[in-house]
A protein has these predicted regions:
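A short core secondary-structure module
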Residues: 148, 152-196
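Flexible, small-/acidic-enriched active-site or ligand-binding loops
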Residues: 137, 190-221
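A short, Trp-centered hydrophobic/proline-enriched beta-strand micro-motif
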Residues: 118-126, 170
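Long, acidic (Asp/Glu-rich), low-complexity accessory segments flanking structured domains
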Residues: 213-235
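Short Ser/Thr-interspersed hydrophobic loop/turn segments at strand-loop and sheet-helix junctions
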Residues: 51, 74-79, 171, 187-192, ...
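Alpha-helical interface subdomain recognition
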Residues: 1-86, 102-107, 114-119, 132-135, ...
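Short Gly/Pro-enriched turn/cap motifs at secondary-structure boundaries
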Residues: 88, 115, 130-133, 157-160, ...
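Helix-loop "lid/cap" segments that line or gate small-molecule binding pockets
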Residues: 93-102
Length: 378
């Protein structure tokens, strides 16, 4: 196998600490979290104490000033252990950068240290009942009234929505201006008129709280506008490459874990007097998956390298997201097949990982949208 060269000894020490933390604080409880539909709120505070949240933020805002590889380590370890209920990456690598890049100094100092410590859990509210991939179709509005914006509308499929203390809301400040009329706002969960709907029951990722959000005459200070009014769509487009890279990183880690589980299972499971791994079809399937995962790993690591250099462009990030998650789902399906009937039993991690993987091709921009982005760049 091709050795990975991106990570320093310091990164690997951090990886060891992340793995130890997750094996102690998350793995024993994840099954219960799947039943209740959300993870224990205390895990966020413990993760903050362990330095696992928003490590990339500058020290002046409570972070470590670390590079993105520390975020990648957390994503990979969460993915390898099948802990899909944990929304750390969305909080650290998707929401926090919006505040860092577009928030005022007052907003940064008010909120970012609380994100680092786990005192506040965050979410981003883009998707609506009638607007998914088409963000220009958002109907939620924000109308300036004196020194406040008044927000009305609804959101759905919001990850971390149930536990969120702070939400970035995508809303139209000028509904007639299309994409140029979109703005981003910070809304605290205890703001009057902001209600959380039911937690949504999903096919997979059952421990990840996913909720509906409702806004009825929600008043927020105009200072809670991120950046400039009407620039929200542009900000979203600038930040999406990192979001899509995080999905690809997690997808490859999940595929690698699934292959290892399947190697172990097929070596132990016997049929017709010999191990399943000794059958030619099994060996060929394992060889094919190992090769494709290796190809995916090299590509995603190169994307990580480009991202560290500030050179990861939108089409390449789209390639990583689409190809990485397609591969993840392909590998998980093959691994379930090699597990036979046991692969369809919820008590086996391969079954849960298979169910969890399917949505990877849908969120963060569907894979069809990814192909459209790639095609436009050709």
């Amino acid at each position: 196998m091709i050795p990975r060269t991106l990570f320093s000894p310091e990164h690997e020490l951090f990886r060891d600490s992340v793995r130890t933390f997750l094996e102690k604080e998350a793995v024993p409880f994840h099954g219960q979290w799947e039943k209740q539909g959300y993870i224990d709120r205390k895990l966020w505070n413990k993760a903050g104490e362990a330095g696992m949240l928003c490590s990339h933020l500058p020290e002046e805002y409570g972070g470590l000033g670390a590079d993105f590889l520390y975020s990648a380590v957390v994503i990979e370890e969460v993915g390898r252990l099948g802990l899909t209920g944990i929304g750390f990456s969305l909080h650290s690598d998707i929401v926090a950068p919006y505040i860092l890049h577009y928030g005022s100094e007052a907003l940064k100092h008010k909120y970012l240290p609380k994100l680092v410590s786990g005192e506040m859990v965050t979410a981003i509210a883009m998707t609506e009942p009638g607007a998914g991939s088409d963000l220009q179709g958002v109907k939620t509005t924000a109308v300036l009234d004196g020194d406040e914006y008044v927000i009305n509308g609804s959101k759905t499929f919001i990850t971390n929505g149930f536990l969120a203390d702070l939400v970035i809301v995508v809303a139209k400040t000028d509904p007639k201006a299309g994409a140029k009329g979109t703005s981003l706002f910070l809304v605290e969960a205890n703001t009057p008129g902001f209600d959380k709907g039911k937690r949504l029951e999903k096919v997979g990722m059952k421990a990840q709280d996913t909720s509906e959000l409702f806004f009825q005459d929600v008043r927020v200070p105009k200072e809670n506008l991120l950046g400039q009014a009407g620039m929200g769509f542009a900000y979203l487009m600038q930040e999406l490459p990192q979001e899509r890279l995080t999905v690809a990183i997690g997808g490859l880690a999940s595929a690698e874990a699934a292959l290892q589980w399947t190697l172990d299972y097929t070596r132990e499971r016997k049929a017709f007097g010999k191990a399943i791994a000794d059958f030619q079809n099994t060996r060929f399937k394992l060889a094919e998956m190992a090769t494709e995962i290796q190809i995916g790993r090299v590509f995603v690591d190169r994307c990580l390298e480009l991202h560290l250099q500030g050179k990861l462009d939108v089409p390449t990030a789209a390639m990583a997201k689409y190809w990485g998650t397609d591969l993840q789902c392909k590998v998980l399906d093959e691994c379930v097949q090699l597990h036979g009937g046991y692969g369809f039993m919820w008590e086996y991690p391969i079954a849960r990982a298979w169910a969890d993987a399917r949505v990877q091709r849908i969120y963060a921009g569907t894979n069809e949208i990814m192909k459209e982005i790639i095609a436009r760049s050709l």
